[in-house]
């Protein structure tokens, strides 16, 4: 029994720590005079090119087309712009923990693209190379990031700090979004999908999925536990509401984690599965009627289901939502004071932040870039291209997105005219309205003590628990074991004869 439990615990711990990485690595030898830039990002997170002619995106202020991969385009652009050759060695990771494990085990990268909490962890551990002052020079026409980053995103990166230093000192945003439910409106009502309690709703027993990682499972669970507080008018209307919301949603006190463990065990009994990537396919196939998703994956699921004439909706729970970011950071262990590497890494960020490339990547992965484009209207035109109503449509509504593009939600230059259904579908996932933004909270980096407590909680929730096996199930297992023993014994007896 002890050996069994040890093996089970060891496996579960391996899952949590991500020491079984699934990396796709493109490692090549380069000449001494070529800058070697080692980049590591999420799988399928940069456009790979190979677009067909009918995939060309025609916008008012330009045409977007991905003939070759974004990485190859960058290498060519860098040589044409700076007269130096750079070779990008591109690797992929599946989870933040996998990336961190690789770094811990000695793998070296110059530029990586983790999520917000991992950026905070790497900042706290002093592993990041700060962005140079030149990177923030708005007078440089090639600094596409600082000239084009959304005013809203820029304020979030400036206001959030680790050890007294803002995120923006070390990180440049790439993609951002929220969490919520993708659901089948023919089965689940808008009201039912507007609360995290959907995960516990017995009406949808074994028909809903939740994410199979501790942070994305813990966030909605805390929201369920604190639902009454989060919806209380005095709390919502308080002067420092967002500060209080951030505190409540990052509560790691022992008592709340103990409660979360019990509630997650209840959720485990009600949901169809804990999943990382299969939830989208389960929605499209009809195995499940709702799935907790990151907004980008939600858009993908809605897009794919439409091809089968199945129309799914997006719901953001009324309690709150998780505001998340993926961003580019340079590693000290990779850059090592090499000015050429640092310049190439920052140029890579800028190249991806150029408006036409932003459109390419958004079109490829379905997520929302942190880039609004600044003076370049291409990104806004692309959003209108995707979601704007046709000229002859009569049933339309206005949908403001000025908070993202101009820092002012009432800016008349950034009000889309859309079909009403989009207010509950892809557009609302990619560019949520201000009421959603106001009730969003970033999950913070937890210290070692809190991490240990939370990881142990997750082991208790996700790993096989012998105490939960009923007497009837034990009898069934015993009978099965007995039958197996008889069969094996018979085979051995026959062979000996």
Question: What do these predicted ranges mean?
Answer:
Residues 21-33, 494-496:
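Sec-dependent signal peptide cleavage junction
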Residues 27-121, 125:
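Early extracytoplasmic/lumenal segment of secretory-pathway proteins
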Residues 40-54, 60-67, 117-119, 123-270, ...:
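Extracytoplasmic ligand-binding site segments that recognize negatively charged/polar headgroups
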Residues 122-132, 166-168, 301-316, 392:
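Ligand-binding "clamshell"
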Residues 269-338:
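Extracytoplasmic/periplasmic substrate-binding proteins
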Residues 330-431:
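Mature extracytoplasmic/periplasmic domains
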Residues 405-497:
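Conserved C-terminal helix/tail region of periplasmic/extracytoplasmic solute-binding proteins
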């Amino acid at each position: 029994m002890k050996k069994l439990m040890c093996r089970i615990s060891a496996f579960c711990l391996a899952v949590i720590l991500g020491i079984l990485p699934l990396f796709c690595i493109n490692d090549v030898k380069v000449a001494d005079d070529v800058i070697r830039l080692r980049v590591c990002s999420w799988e399928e997170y940069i456009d790979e090119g190979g677009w067909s002619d009918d995939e060309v995106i025609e916008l008012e202020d330009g045409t977007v087309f991905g003939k070759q991969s974004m990485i190859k385009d960058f290498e060519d652009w860098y040589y044409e712009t700076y007269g130096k050759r750079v070779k990008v060695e591109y690797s992929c990771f599946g989870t933040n923990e996998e990336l961190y494990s690789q770094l811990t085990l000695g793998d070296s990268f110059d530029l990586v693209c983790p999520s917000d909490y991992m950026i905070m962890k790497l900042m706290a551990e002093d592993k990041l190379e700060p962005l140079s002052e030149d990177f923030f020079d708005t007078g440089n026409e090639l600094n596409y990031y600082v000239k084009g980053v959304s005013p809203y995103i820029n304020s979030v990166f400036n206001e959030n700090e680790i050890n007294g230093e803002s995120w923006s000192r070390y990180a440049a945003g790439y993609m951002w979004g929220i969490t919520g439910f993708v659901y089948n409106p023919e089965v689940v009502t808008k009201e039912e999908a507007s609360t995290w309690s959907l995960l516990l709703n017995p009406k949808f027993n074994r028909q809903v999925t939740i994410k199979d990682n501790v942070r994305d499972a813990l966030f909605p669970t805390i929201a369920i536990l604190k639902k009454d507080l989060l919806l209380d008018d005095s709390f919502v209307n308080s002067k420092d509401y967002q500060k209080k919301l951030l505190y409540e949603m990052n509560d790691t006190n022992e008592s709340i984690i103990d409660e979360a463990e019990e509630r997650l065990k209840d959720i485990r009994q009600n949901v169809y599965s804990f999943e990382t990537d299969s939830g989208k396919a389960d929605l499209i196939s009809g195995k499940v009627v709702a799935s907790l998703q990151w907004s980008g994956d939600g858009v993908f699921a809605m897009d794919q289901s439409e091809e089968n004439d199945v129309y799914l909706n997006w719901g953001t729970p009324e309690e709150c939502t998780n505001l998340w970011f993926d961003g580019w950071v340079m590693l000290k262990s990779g850059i090592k004071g090499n000015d050429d590497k640092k310049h190439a890494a920052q140029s890579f960020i800028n190249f991806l932040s150029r408006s036409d490339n932003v459109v390419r990547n958004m079109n490829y992965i379905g997520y929302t870039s942190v880039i609004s484009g600044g003076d370049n209207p291409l990104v806004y035109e692309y959003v209108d291209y995707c979601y704007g109503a046709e000229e002859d449509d009569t049933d339309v509504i206005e949908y403001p997105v000025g908070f993202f593009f101009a820092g002012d939600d009432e800016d008349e230059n950034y009000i889309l005219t859309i079909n009403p259904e989009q207010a509950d579908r892809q557009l609302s996932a990619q560019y949520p309205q201000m009421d959603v933004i106001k009730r969003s909270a970033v999950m913070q980096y937890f210290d070692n003590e809190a991490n240990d407590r939370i990881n142990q909680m997750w082991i208790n929730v996700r790993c096989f628990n012998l105490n939960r096996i009923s007497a009837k199930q034990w009898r069934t297992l015993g009978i099965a074991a007995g039958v197996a023993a008889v069969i094996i014994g018979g085979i051995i007896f026959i062979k000996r004869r």
